[in-house]
Amino acid sequence: MNQVEMTEFPVGKPQEALYGVASTPDGALWFTLAKGNAIGRLSPDGAVSRFPLPHTDGQPTTITCGPDGRPWFTLSSANAIGRLAPDGALRMFELPRPASRPFGIAGGHDGCLWFAEMAGDRIGRITIDGDIEEYDLPVKGGYPSCMAAGRDGLMWFTLNQAGAVGSISATAAPRIFPLGAADAAPVGIASDAQGALWIAQAGNGAIVRFDAGGRITEFPLHSRAARPHAIAADAAGNLWFTEWGANRIGRISEAGDLAGYELAAPGSEPHGIAIDPHGCVWAALETGRLVRLQASPRD
């Protein structure tokens, strides 16, 4: 495997709680400052821009590149979905029901954005124009968390407090699939090129592969206290994930081979993760830095 080079870019202050990160087709990195009440942009030339949000405490958390090539993000405390244009023009879409606490968000095959409502026990769908539909889940108190588009045309999500994943579409009712471990606490979810889903289980320090046939394979990490959080797939067949509790970025191949990369500063608290158009891996560190790793080819 080629040597992985890690480079950090200061983009915020530790007290601003840098959280989510997403890449757009122009090579820019967009990120959320959960306590800084702002969205930031790191351009390919290294310039940092900041876009304040019109809330005292909107708590922007997860961010993704939408089907329109623009950054879309959830505001957990403001109960809204936001979208930014490259020039900083902001649109906000308030959710129909209060205190839903939207969290995970991902683009779907239908050209819409799908999001998880942690406190609402619902999955939401928003069009590019801002029309919102919501779908009740059959599990109460499950804490729907992160979203991913599956190769099967469905949207998949984690249920953090139910130890399960679920699937849904605009025409298919939600289905729930327990992961088997009572302490799993799944958070991040991603789909690989073979159609399998990969889940970061923060509760028991493992990465799980959930294949198209429903078979579950668990890959324990070096420490059960690693607290894997976000996960993303690269084009080479690797899954990259943040280890919030272990101060590392992890990598797992489709065959289950694991590797880990220590962050330079102790207590960096990595959260969100994304892959840019050049195949580099980016992670958001709560210390106010983005770290870039040059993605290695498959072993």
From Swiss-Prot:
Mg(2+) binds at E269, E286. Its cofactor is Mg(2+). Gene3D superfamilies: YVTN repeat-like/Quinoprotein amine dehydrogenase. Keywords: Antibiotic resistance, Lyase, Magnesium, Metal-binding. Its EC number is 4.2.99.-. It comes from the Bacteria. GO terms for molecular function: carbon-oxygen lyase activity; magnesium ion binding. One of its GO terms (cellular component) is outer membrane-bounded periplasmic space. Substrate binds at H229. The keyword Lyase applies. The active site is at H271. GO terms for biological process: antibiotic catabolic process; response to antibiotic. Belongs to the Vgb family. Monomer. Inactivates the type B streptogramin antibiotics by linearizing the lactone ring at the ester linkage, generating a free phenylglycine carboxylate and converting the threonyl moiety into 2-amino-butenoic acid. This is Virginiamycin B lyase. It comes from Bordetella parapertussis (strain 12822 / ATCC BAA-587 / NCTC 13253). The gene is vgb.
